[in-house]
Amino acid sequence: MRGYFIAGNWKMHKTCAEAVALAQELVRELRGGPHTYMIAPSFTALDAVGKVLRGSNVLLGAQDVSSEEWGAHTGEVSVLQLEDLGVQVVIVGHSERRHGRGENDKLINQKVRRVLESGLRVILCVGERLQEYEAGCTNEVVGTQVRAGMADVCGSLMHNVTVAYEPVWAIGTGKTATPAQANAVHAHIRSVVREMYGAAIAEALCIQYGGSMKAENARALLAEEHIDGGLIGGASLEAASFVPIARSV
């Protein structure tokens, strides 16, 4: 049976001191919780936050990684460096990287494989933009991103893969995906993975929802059959908004 995976992506928020304080509060609040939890602070706070999380049930995540292994790549951070800081999970292909920084499926796949080959876990983000949603292309776009993101990934590594569905059109636009709409896309993602890897791997795959999950809608979303957790942005920046989501299931 799939467990729930509740993850917070802090994006470019929090000073190091603020990140440490929030991490300490979350460790206290989530201690003994029945699910998998993760927080992904900025690179600058990874070391300090990692020390807070050590020995807790909250995993340390990174928001991105270089596709390169090592060497002369100014401004890049390698998976080896992340692993050295105690990072356990890496977010790859977030919509803000795809559409804000021009990352394409080929680069995202390189990052996915780099993370998995290192033995770390990866969260592969997929999702359609507003114009793609309005054109009825959701399944086509998301399916293409899943297939491309997992290209050449061995089935034996799939236990370290989580997929996060981000309907970009539902983030900061005033539009929302209903639980049923989100679940239908999650079911499609699972069917694509079933075609690629077979039923056992597809049924075991954790698929998070990343479309503005909040305490107010978390319970309804997480009650859906194919929604196995959340990749949470704004609501993860305060314990008062993140903990209720984590406790909603």
From Swiss-Prot:
Per the UniProt record, which EC number(s) apply here? 5.3.1.1
- Span-the-membrane segments of this chain are none
Binding-site list for substrate: 9-11, 172, 212, 233-234
Q: Which CDD domains match?
A: TIM
Task: Kindly give the PROSITE patterns that the UniProt entry links to this protein.
Answer: TIM_1, TIM_2
Reaction catalysed?
D-glyceraldehyde 3-phosphate = dihydroxyacetone phosphate
Name of a matching Pfam family: TIM
Q: Which GO terms describe its cellular component?
A: cytosol
Q: Does the keyword Ligase apply?
A: no
Question: What GO molecular-function term can you cite, just one?
Answer: triose-phosphate isomerase activity
Q: What is its main location?
A: cytoplasm
Which keywords does this chain's UniProt record carry? Cytoplasm, Gluconeogenesis, Glycolysis, Isomerase
Q: Where is the protein localized?
A: Cytoplasm
Task: Say which family it is in.
Answer: Belongs to the triosephosphate isomerase family.
Per the entry, what this protein does is: Involved in the gluconeogenesis. Catalyzes stereospecifically the conversion of dihydroxyacetone phosphate (DHAP) to D-glyceraldehyde-3-phosphate (G3P).
Q: Which HAMAP family match?
A: TIM_B
Task: State what protein this is by name.
Answer: Triosephosphate isomerase
Which gene specifies this protein's sequence? tpiA
